[in-house]
Structure formats: C-alpha cells, structure tokens
UniProtKB/Swiss-Prot annotation:
Domain UBA positions: 288-329
Catalytic activity entry: L-seryl-[protein] + ATP = O-phospho-L-seryl-[protein] + ADP + H(+); L-threonyl-[protein] + ATP = O-phospho-L-threonyl-[protein] + ADP + H(+)
Protein name per its UniProtKB record: Probable serine/threonine-protein kinase DDB_G0277165
Family, as annotated: Belongs to the protein kinase superfamily. CAMK Ser/Thr protein kinase family.
Residue ranges of the region described as Disordered: 338-472, 528-626, 764-799
Pfam families hit by this protein: Pkinase
Active site: D133
SMART domains from the UniProt entry: S_TKc
C-alpha cells in the first residue's frame, strides 16, 4: 500500500534528497503545522552498519538538543522498511544557497549570522556534543533569517579532556588535526570550522580550496590563507585566532563571545548551562530504568552496560545520569500534542480522518450530513430571533448545500443576490458551489494560520456581493474558489458554526473566525493538503488561468492570472506533471559564482547531499579512490525512486527509539547479563547476502583484497597499541580468526580491551548503473558460478550486482563501549575505501 500519511502528518512534496533518503514536507492533519519528514530506507542501514550507527546517534543527539538555533526532531515513526524522522521545518533553505545568491555579506549581516552559529554551538558544547561537520550546507535559515544547526550525523558525545580519533567531516571545513589523522579535541575542531564559515560569510570564498584533494589537505595542515584587506580589523583578528593551526592556541567559544568584533553590536547573550551543572536525582534501583532511554544512552557510547546501569543508581553525579534525565524529560515532551500548534483546551475542529483522506485522493464529493445542516439552520434562526432585532429575518445564515431543505421560510436559499440586514452576508447555493468564499467546516483553518488580506466589495456594488478579490486583482478578474469537497461535519463543528453566526449578528461586523462567511478558502487546510498531493496538475492550471470565464468544474480550482497572492491554487485535473512549491526560498542565480562552489564533498561539483564523509587520511588515500566512491554514491542515488514517487509499505507506527536499532544493535540490550556482549539476530537483505554472524556486534563488508585487509588491520591495531594474535585458520571455508586485546591487564587478570575478529569470503548485493547492464551480463557469462544466483528485482526494478568480497565480523569481549566504537569505526574506514 502507498503511504500518504505518517501518524498525524500528511506527506507532501519532496524538499531534498541525500545519501540516506528523502526529506518531504509534512502537514499536521488537525493544525496545519509544517514539519520535515526524513524518510530512510532500512535496507541501506542493514547493508552499511556505519550508516546505521550514524542515524542511530543522530536520533539520540537531537533528542538531547532544545535550542532556538538548532533544528528540532519531534518524534520517530517506522515501518518494516522505512524510518520516518519528524523534523522541524525550516523554510529558508541552506545558508550556502543564501551565500551563493548574495556573495560576501556586509559586516553587520555576517556578524548577525555568526553570532547565532556560535550561540547554538555553545549550547551543543554545553551538552558535551561536538558537531564535527559544520558547514554552510548544514546551517539552515528560518523565514526570519534565524540560523538552525542541522545534520548531527557526525556528532559525538565528548567527555571532559577526552580526545576523538575518527577523521570525519568535509575537508574544506575540517581542522588541521582532523585531516592529519591524529587524536583531536572535538570542540576545538568545531571552532576551526566556524572560522572557515566566518571567512565565507565575509568574503564569499573559502580560505582553503583546491581541486586536488592532496594539495587541499596540505593547505589546511599549513593553515596559510589570504586575508582580504576590506575585512574589518577586528574581524581579521578574530579570524586569525580561530584559524590557528595549533589547537592549544586556538581561541575558545568563551573567548569568541568576549571578542571586540563579536560584541560590537552590543548584543547580550545568555550563557549556556554546562551539562555538569544540571541537577539530576539518581534512580532507586535497576527496575526503574526505562528501556528506550537506556538504549539511547548505549547508542551514545557512554559506557558498557554495567557501567551505565551503575551510574544511573549511583549517588555520585555523572553525565550519564544527567543525559538519562534529559531524555526522560524529552520522552514526556513527545507525548505533548500542543507542540504541533494545538492551543490548550481548544476543540480540535479540523481533523482529517483516514476516511476523509481516502476521499481526498479519490476526489469524491460527500454531502451526507444534510440533516445536521438543517438542524444548524433551525438553531441559528432561533438564536438569532432571541438575540437580534432583525424583523424575524435570518438572512445571515449561510446554506452551502442545495440539498438542505430548511423549514424556516425566512431563509432565501436560492437567491444569488440576497442581501442580509447587515449587508455583510448572502446565500448562494447554486450548483452546490460558493463564489469567493465557503462556510464548509471541513476547510476551516486553525487560528494560527494567517489569511491574506482581501478587499470586500461593498453591498451596493454592481458586481456580485459575495465576491472577494486580492488587493492586486481587478474587478474583471474574479477569484473562483473550489466547490465544497467534504461536508462531513460533526456536531461540535455545527455548534461552533451556530455560535459564530450569532456573534456575527450581534456585533454587526465581519468575524475573523475560521467559520466566518467572509473567510477565503484558497488558503484552507484542506487545500494545503490537496496542494501537496496534487502537485503535478499545476501546469494545466497555469495554462488555463488566463481565461476570465467563471466556469466552476466539479473538482477544479482556478485562480485569476493577475493575482499576486503568495499562495497558488492548484488544479485537481490528473493530466499535468509540474511540481508546485508552496514555500519560498532564496532565488539562486542561473550560474553560480566561480569563487564559491559547494565543497561538501571531495570534488567541488558534487552535491553535498550525496557527498561521502571524509573517511580518509591525507597520507593514505588517493583522489582516485575518493572520486570512485563519490561516483558509486551517485549511481546509487540515480537509481532510487523519483522524488515524488509514492512510498510503499505498511502503516507507520510511532517509536520513541527505533525498534530497528533495538533489534540490530546488540550492545543496546538492557537485559544482557553481566555486561557481556549479547548475541544479535541474523540480518537479511531480501533473502540475499545473509549475515550469518549471530554473535557479531559489528559487521563490515569489504571488497578489497584479503591480504590488504590483513595489512590494514595490523595498522589499526598498531595505532591503538593493541596486540594481534591469529588463531588456526579453517582451510575448507577459508575463514580466519584473530584475537585483538590491549596490553593493559585488569586486577582480575582480564585485558582492559578485547575483541574477536572473523574474516571470511562473502557475496553481497550492489546496485548496477543502467550503462553497465550489458557489461555485467557479459561478466556473468564468463563466470558461470555466479549464474546460480536467482534474478532479483529490488528497489522498483533496480538491477543488482552480486559482488564478491569479505565479511569482517567483530565480537566485543571486554572493555568500554566507546573504545570499541572508535576501533570499529577506524577499521571500517580503512576497509571500505
């Protein structure tokens, strides 16, 4: 089945697409609250454990963050195939696009953005969270130009005085110590990245840039860049201190906030409270531990199972306990529906049920509530007679259904030019359509959705009195609104309609309530939902909207060609194919300036959304290997579903911590005895390439030569100061086992760190580009042993290549989870190049 909604959200147009999946616009069914819905295919996470760990960590980190300058994540839904991350919708686009359009910014505007970046980053650092991938592509702009730090996939929890090992991020923004492959301070590395961003804000260029990756890394290591003379001297001083090669001499966040240029606009900033200063009460015993929160802590790598459990019940203050309490508060917040635009104690009027959604997609009309409408009119008449001296005339009541046979003779239902006593309202029931407005409660909007200002034609006008035009429209170009699509009104809605009509008569003015007759429907919530699901029809509408004939088709919404309203009214005709956008973003120039191109990847021309992370070290990786990796990602992206293709799967279920992660991340099991490594269930990828390592904590698929695997394995082990011992090889299956352990011994005689590694041949699937289909078929003829594999049709007909390689399975025996995570991450980087 196609998935059109996730929880209370209707899925709309595609906003973007990256390596992990698409991001679509979502609307809350009841309030119209906009969100971004990140859709991740779980098959990608099964085939690439590092990607799974990245998403897992990103989810938990975003649950710990609540700041105006950081993107929020509201909740998580999932099906058997997909993860749905409900994110804050940031309508202004990337800071990168803004810089491409504007070029170098004025000092004041650059400072305005830079201050927000530093304040948001200071908050993250106060939570001991390092971003490690700061760049303009990961900084989003809200409608009022507020910075939102996004993409915490490379983020990490860093304890005091702890150094990080993994080289990650984008090379143009990475610090010298990161690209050099040495241990580094994550917070100092973030400061360097902010320095590069500040340089880009002021100049529209990057301080370190080169098409050749090796020359680029050398420039970063040397820290040599040109300082334009037009930059303010104080800003030059701050840039020099931020782009200092020696991290011990590099300026800190606290010192940045005290710098003369930073405080030159006299803004006062509140200091972020360090996580160590937050009060947290310990748990009474293990039985109080929430399993979802516990798995989240394990995903952060804060310790082993026993260590985390002990810290949660200990009276000694620890960051782990504070994180637990913060996540506990976040879990309570997740159950609060008011975050989606509800007002306390407010009746939810405009819910789109599953049945009404089906009618939206089928385009059927529904006028089944005639009796209720008749009762409404009768009640309105009684109330109006009691509260108004209108000569027993209730022409203020609006009948929008020609099937409503009201017994009250005071209502003139079939007169298109019927004036009421207040000259504000009229009745129009011709062909069950309203001209210029509608009182259908299925099109109501919540109070927080603002309506565009419109001009009301006076009652003595020669044109139809019910017509509304925007300020830019002429009298000859009338806005024709959509007919009523859904009249399934509940009793609460009817009562609200009654009260609103009473208030209209008493006050003798136009009420701005969502039920008011003068409210235009073109911006209604139902229209917004339709607009997202019928984007392809806009082209036909644009070709026909020059016609001034007011011809209302049963399921067509038209608009004046001269209207300059900020919202466009879509057509529901099923023949058009152009995407319609309801959000505005900075208009990009047709040709990007040469001095500032996307640098999110190893090659300047690569889209940062599909860019790999910097999984190389400057002295070991060649540009050819990196370029081939980028190309492989591009091939995988190009064969995915089209941006507006439907999502197929079962109905999404709400999940505070993804069941996928709790199922496949063996180290997250709260019930594991004595902190030992519990066994993981076997993983499958559509029946092909099964991972039979039922006890492995981590699995790496590698295509490089087995001898090179051994060489790289020994390099990593030597770097960490571990010892490697090979066990007897199983000749028949060509499987090799080895033990990795640290030289340091605990008091009980066990090594401080130990893991077991198994290396064996493997066959796993890989997408094949259309241009290589013939070559792949010929390759299968030369190697008949591969023809035994049955033909596959995965991912909508995508061709699959069965690559031969090696599976490296790692079992965590003892030692800290954090050290194990670092070790496996380093090993995967060097084995998957």
């Amino acid at each position: 089945m196609e998935i059109h909604s996730v929880g209370p959200f209707i899925i709309g147009k595609t906003l973007g697409q990256g390596t992990t999946g698409k991001v679509k616009l979502g609307f809350h069914k009841d309030t119209g609250f906009k969100v971004g819905i990140k859709i991740i295919n779980k098959e990608l996470l099964i085939n690439k454990p590092s990607m799974r760990r990245k998403i897992e960590r990103e989810i938990v980190l975003m649950k710990l963050i609540d700041h105006p300058n950081a993107m929020k994540m509201y909740e998580v839904y999932e099906t058997s195939k997909y993860l749905f991350l409900i994110l804050e919708y940031v309508e202004g686009g990337e800071l990168f696009d803004y810089l491409v359009e504007k070029g170098g910014l004025e000092s004041g505007e650059a400072l305005f953005f830079f201050q927000q970046i530093i304040i948001g980053l200071e908050y993250c650092h106060s939570r001991n969270i390092c971003h490690r991938d700061l760049k303009p592509e990961n900084l989003l702009l809200s409608g009022d130009k507020r910075i939102k730090i996004a993409d915490f996939g490379m983020g990490s929890i860093v304890r005091k005085d702890m150094l990080l090992h993994t080289s990650c991020g984008s090379p143009h923004y990475a610090s010298p110590e990161v690209v050099s492959g040495i241990d580094y301070d994550g917070q100092k590395a973030d400061v360097w990245s902010c320095g590069v961003i500040l340089y880009a804000l002021l100049t529209g260029k990057l301080p370190f840039d080169d098409e050749n990756i090796r020359r680029l890394l050398n420039k970063v290591k040397n820290g040599a860049f040109s300082m334009p003379p037009y930059i303010h001297k104080d800003a030059q001083d701050l840039l020099t201190k931020m782009l200092t090669v020696d991290p011990s001499k590099r300026i800190s966040i606290k010192e940045i906030k005290e710098h003369p240029w930073f405080v030159s606009n006299f803004n006062q900033f509140q200091k972020a409270t360090p996580v160590e200063e937050i009060n947290a009460e310990p748990l009474v015993d293990y039985s109080q531990i929430d399993e979802d929160i516990f798995r989240s802590l394990m995903a952060l790598g804060v310790g082993t199972i026993d260590e985390v459990k002990q810290q949660l019940v200990s009276n000694q203050k620890s960051a782990t306990l504070i994180y637990y309490r913060l996540l506990e508060e976040r879990k309570k917040f997740d159950s609060d529906v008011n975050k989606y635009g509800y007002k306390p104690k407010e009746t939810r009027r405009n819910s789109l049920s599953d049945m009404s959604l089906k009618k939206i997609f089928s385009g059927s009309n529904n006028n089944n509530n005639n009796n209720n409408n008749n009762n409404n009119n009768n009640n309105n008449n009684n109330n109006n007679n009691n509260n108004n001296n209108n000569n027993n005339n209730n022409n203020n009541n609006i009948n929008i259904n020609n099937n409503n046979n009201n017994n009250n003779n005071n209502n003139n239902n079939n007169n298109n030019n019927n004036n009421n006593n207040n000259n504000n309202n009229n009745n129009n029931n011709n062909n069950n359509s309203a001209v210029g407005k509608s009182n259908d409660s299925s099109s109501q909007q919540p109070p927080h959705i603002q309506q565009p200002h419109s001009q009301q034609i006076p009652s003595n006008s020669t044109s139809q009195e019910s017509m509304q035009i925007s300020p830019s429209n002429s009298a000859n170009n009338m806005a024709i609104q959509q007919p009523i699509i859904n009249n399934n009104n509940n009793n609460n809605n009817n009562n609200n309609n009654i009260n609103n009509n009473i208030n209209n008569n008493i006050n003798n003015n136009i009420n701005n309530n969502s039920n008011n007759v003068n409210r235009p429907t073109s911006e209604g919530l139902l229209k917004q939902a339709l607009q997202q699901h019928h984007q392809q029809q806009q082209q036909q509408f644009n070709g026909n909207n020059n016609n001034n004939t007011m011809n209302v088709q049963p399921l067509t919404m038209s608009a004046s060609s001269s209207s300059s309203s900020s919202s466009t009214t879509p057509s529901l005709s099923p023949n058009s194919s152009t995407t319609s956008s309801t959000s505005t973003s900075p208009q990009l120039s047709a040709i990007k300036p040469d001095h500032y191109q996307r640098r999110g990847s190893m090659t300047a021309s690569t889209n940062p959304a599909t860019s790999p992370t910097m999984s190389h070290r400057g002295k070991t990786s060649s540009p050819i290997e990196i370029t081939s990796k980028v190309r492989k990602l591009k091939i995988s992206e190009s064969q995915s579903n089209t941006p507006n293709s439907p999502i197929i799967g079962s109905s999404p279920k709400k999940s505070w911590f993804s069941y996928f992660f709790s199922k496949n991340s063996s180290s997250n099991n709260l019930n594991a005895a004595n902190g030992s490594a519990p066994s993981s269930p076997s993983l499958q990828s559509n029946g092909v390439g099964q991972l039979q390592t039922t006890q492995a904590n981590y699995v790496i698929e590698s295509k490089i030569d087995v001898n090179l695997i051994y060489v790289n394995l020994e390099k990593i082990i030597k770097k960490y100061g571990f010892e490697l011992k090979y066990q007897q090889q199983q000749q028949q299956q060509n499987i090799k086992h080895c033990i990795v352990r640290s030289h340091h011994i605990n008091s009980d005689g066990t090594p401080q760190f130990e893991c077991e590694i198994e290396i064996k041949p493997s066959t796993f699937i890989n997408p094949v580009s259309p241009s290589k289909q013939h070559h792949h078929h010929h390759h299968q003829q030369q190697q008949p042993q591969q023809q035994q594999m049955p033909p596959l049709n995965l991912n909508g007909g995508q061709n699959i290549n069965h690559d031969q390689g090696f599976r490296v399975s790692i079992i965590h025996k003892s030692g800290s989870q954090h050290k194990f995570n670092n070790f496996t991450s380093s090993l995967e980087q060097i084995l998957t190049i």
